[in-house]
A protein has these predicted regions:
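Active-site proximal loops enriched in glycine and acidic residues that flank catalytic Cys/His/Asp
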Residues: 241, 252-253, 273-275, 302, ...
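Conserved PRPP/pyrophosphate-binding segment of the phosphoribosyltransferase/PRPP-pathway fold
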Residues: 336-432
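PRPP-dependent phosphoribosyltransferase catalytic core
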Residues: 230, 245-247, 252, 264, ...
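Conserved short alpha-helical segments that host acidic/polar catalytic motifs at enzyme active sites
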Residues: 1-293, 299-362, 366-367, 376
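Hydrophobic "anchor" residues on beta-strands that sit immediately upstream
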Residues: 150, 454-457, 483
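Active-site catalytic pocket residues across diverse enzymes, especially alpha/beta-hydrolases
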Residues: 167, 381, 385, 475, ...
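Intrinsically disordered, low-complexity domain-flanking/linker segments in eukaryotic proteins
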Residues: 91-101, 198-215, 388-405, 527-539
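Extended, hydrophobic alpha-helical segments in both membrane/secreted and soluble proteins
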Residues: 363, 370-377, 414, 445, ...
């Protein structure tokens, strides 16, 4: 992807179902769970590089002994830093007391991080500061085991303000205004309430205070707590939690916006945001891993029993299509096929644009995430050539051997043109100097482009277009092609996201800039004022009654008109070559990714009522010149 875009976080959860000495005997290590957690998190490092965290709970320890361990990091390589700290503590303990080496019970008693249930997180920050205090898992502590709550998740709520105010109305004083703290305190409130109720019931039944604790853990109903906690949530989420006594849960939003997968056998229960992470870490086949159903929670009690319960009624499934285009690892079998299909489906538009002149066209891609869609594009052009050659031979009954060789020798010219050279550090604040550095983020391969060539280069998506304008187009133009065609395997990104992607401002989106330019060009810019007034009028309406009026502005122009204006905005005064930017259609996106139909950033069709609130706020912020977040 050419535009830097922060996005989804990643969740990892392991529940060991056997005693720790089982793993020591079978796998040679008491630290089996920790090692698997490292793999799960490392295989999801694409989902978060701002921070990483790990927490574990030990079962059945004596009073006075620590049973919860947590470590978090915002270092340059946070996952490695987290597990380096864990390994250092383990190795130091083993060095200081050699008796621990072969005694699992002593290891559990004296070494932190060893536990039966673990929760990990990799973070990209879209809300809050990027400090270690902002890194999951979060911990809500209490002297009662069953009132300790550890929380980590991949989520963004659109109605944080309302949820925060609800807590204040309950008499609470949340320590931060963030969705994570708000969600944790919401769950914590109903956890406390249920514990108090169970305790009162047990006292009435004649149990002593010390007898109550273990009985509370057996009577606690996580499903009830989650139903009460989540009934007002509006957003996309996968939230993982652990209760101090050993219960744990994973809850997914009703529209299935955020992804979650799980696996269970007689040794372990595993949950992760991405399927390949589980496949690789546990050497599994595709069909052994299941998807967490939308609106449902995986509930794992201390006894190791897994139940899947509906917490919220599932709505129409709108799983995020950007997961398939860009965010998730391309090693997933289905995602790999879908990205190839995106490349295949856009090829007819490309062929039309080059007037079917394959001989004078060179095909390439922007590294690295567009590589798979590039393979699909190449496969499609190969299929076109096969049909063309077949027809040429069949339609010429007098064709000679030399002519057959000439026909068969036509091939698509495939070259590696763009090379991602450096990860730019913006340590220079002067705009002109920084822009010069941005221009060199990518390097190019010289000597393969002729002046008569059209260079076709595919990217997975175009969000803001900054790198395209300041670096990629200038760089490609140096090669001297007649024409440059930039292909986006995704449709035009027209609307802000509010479920975990760093695209909250309308005015930063190149498609919205193109819309504004078209309104000016066609003397319709006054519609901006009238749209602003409509948006202001509905500021105080309930989310369910808000209309997305920005859609009306886009409806004035065709997708082709907007693409042409995007081309003009990004290429004017930048290149000598003619430039054309082509975007995927919404229809082809849905064909390629039939199980991930969440397309609100392309269409403005938000899967929750809060989405319309966000786009309404985003337009008001744009009009008023307010840079604050829209939710």
């Amino acid at each position: 992807m050419s535009d830097a875009l922060k996005h989804e976080c990643g969740v990892a959860h392991i529940r060991l179902l056997k005693p720790l000495d089982y793993y020591k005997k079978k796998y040679g290590s008491t630290f089996y769970g920790i090692n698997k957690m490292y793999l799960l998190m490392e295989k999801q490092h694409n989902r978060g590089q701002d921070g990483a965290g790990f927490a574990s709970i030990k079962f059945d320890v004596e009073p006075g002994e620590r049973y919860i361990s947590r470590v978090r990091s915002v270092e340059q390589q946070p996952i490695q830093d987290v597990f380096s700290k864990i390994n250092t503590r383990i190795n130091d303990a083993l060095d200081e007391n050699p008796l621990l080496k072969d005694d699992v019970s002593l290891q559990k008693k004296h070494i932190p991080y060893i536990g039966e249930v673990m929760l990990g997180h990799v973070r990209y920050g879209t809300f809050g500061k990027n400090s270690v205090e902002s890194v999951h898992p979060f911990l809500r502590q209490n002297n009662w085991k069953h009132r300790n709550l550890i929380l980590a998740g991949n989520f963004n709520m659109t109605n944080v303000k309302d949820l925060f105010n609800n807590l204040v109305e309950l008499g609470q004083h949340p320590k931060e205004y963030t969705d994570t703290i708000t969600i944790m305190e919401k769950i914590g409130h109903f956890l406390d309430a249920q514990v108090r109720k169970i305790y009162k019931d047990l006292k009435k039944e004649g149990f002593t205070k010390s007898e109550c604790s273990p009985l509370i853990t057996k009577r606690l109903k996580l499903s009830k707590i989650l139903k009460k906690s989540s009934k007002d949530w509006d957003g996309g989420y996968v939230i993982g939690g652990m209760i101090g006594h050993g219960d744990s849960f994973i809850l997914r939003d009703p529209a299935g916006i955020r992804p979650a997968f799980y696996y269970k056998d007689d040794e372990v229960i595993v949950v992760a945001s991405e399927r390949p992470a589980i496949q690789t870490a546990f050497n599994l086949k595709l069909d052994q891993i299941k998807e967490v159903p939308p609106g449902n929670a995986l509930l794992i009690n201390k006894a190791g029993e897994l139940n899947i319960k509906e917490i919220l009624p599932p709505t129409e499934k709108k799983a995020c299509s950007f997961e398939r285009i860009y965010f998730s690892r391309g090693s997933d079998a289905d995602i790999y096929k879908e990205r190839k299909e995106l490349g295949k489906l856009i090829m007819p538009t490309i062929l039309k644009e080059i007037n079917y002149d394959i001989s004078n066209s060179v095909f390439s891609y922007i590294p690295n995430t567009a590589e798979t869609s590039f393979y699909g594009m190449v496969e499609s052009v190969d299929n076109y050539l096969i049909n063309k050659k077949t027809n040429e031979i069949l339609n010429n009954k007098n064709i000679s051997k030399e002519q057959i060789v000439e026909v068969l020798s036509e091939r698509a010219r495939i070259e590696k043109i763009a090379i991602k050279d450096v990860k730019l550090r913006t340590f220079i604040t002067e705009d002109s100097s920084r822009d010069d550095l941005v221009e060199h983020v990518y390097d190019i391969t010289y000597g393969v482009i002729k002046k008569t060539d059209t260079l076709i280069i595919i990217d997975d998506s175009i969000v803001r277009g900054t790198t395209l304008k300041k670096s990629i187009l200038k760089m490609l133009d140096r090669l001297g092609p007649k024409k440059i065609i930039v292909v986006s395997s995704a449709p035009q990104i027209r609307y802000p996201d509010c479920y975990g992607i760093d695209m909250a401002n309308l005015e930063s989106l190149i498609a919205f800039k193109a819309l504004l330019s078209l309104l000016k060009q066609t003397n319709q810019y006054s519609l901006i004022d009238s749209t602003y007034k409509k948006c202001k009028k509905q500021e105080l309406l309930p989310d369910s009654e808000i209309t997305n009026y920005v859609k009306d502005l886009y409806s004035l122009f065709s997708a082709e008109e907007i693409s042409t204006m995007i081309t003009s905005l990004l290429s004017t005064d930048v290149t000598s070559a003619e430039v054309k930017i082509i975007f995927q259609s919404i229809e082809n996106l849905h064909k390629a990714c039939p199980n991930n139909l969440g397309d609100w950033y392309f269409t403005g069709n938000y899967p929750t009522n809060g989405g319309n609130r966000v786009v309404n706020n985003a337009f008001i912020n744009f009009f008023e010149g307010n840079k604050k977040r829209a939710y």
